[in-house]
């Protein structure tokens, strides 16, 4: 009797994890889209936005965040206002897009709550 419940429990747990990760992916994509609309100089000239899977990293130090913030990227405004530097793990999301026939890519780093983009390259 107990062994018949195991597959049901596994299915429920897997479904819960799947829905939670889909929600995080969607939230991250929305934050990046809002960041682009606000900070990209040519946001209305890009098409074909394609997002990779959301990932996490511990390998981004405060000094690396400073470097990315200072360098920025082509097509983006120079004086972007960021929030406070986060502590702990960061999420990252890669986005590919087309601008004037060229396929370009940027990586966006988000805080652990997926509330804001803290740096990008």
Walk through the language-model features, giving the residues of each.
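Sec-dependent bacterial lipoprotein signal peptides
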Residues: 1-22
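Cystatin/cathelin-like cysteine-protease inhibitor module
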Residues: 22-121
């Amino acid at each position: 009797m107990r062994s018949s419940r195991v597959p049901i429990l596994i299915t429920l747990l897997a479904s819960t994890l799947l829905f939670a990760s889909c929600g995080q992916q969607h939230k991250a994509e929305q934050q990046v889209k809002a960041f682009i609309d606000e900070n990209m100089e040519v946001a209305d000239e890009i098409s074909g936005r394609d997002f990779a899977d959301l990932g996490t990293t511990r390998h981004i130090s405060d000094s690396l965040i400073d470097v990315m913030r200072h360098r920025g990227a082509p097509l983006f405004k120079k004086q972007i206002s960021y929030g406070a530097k986060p502590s702990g793990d960061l999420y990252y999301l890669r986005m590919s897009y087309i601008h004037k026939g060229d396929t370009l890519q940027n990586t966006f780093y988000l805080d652990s709550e997926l509330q804001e983009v803290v740096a990008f390259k």
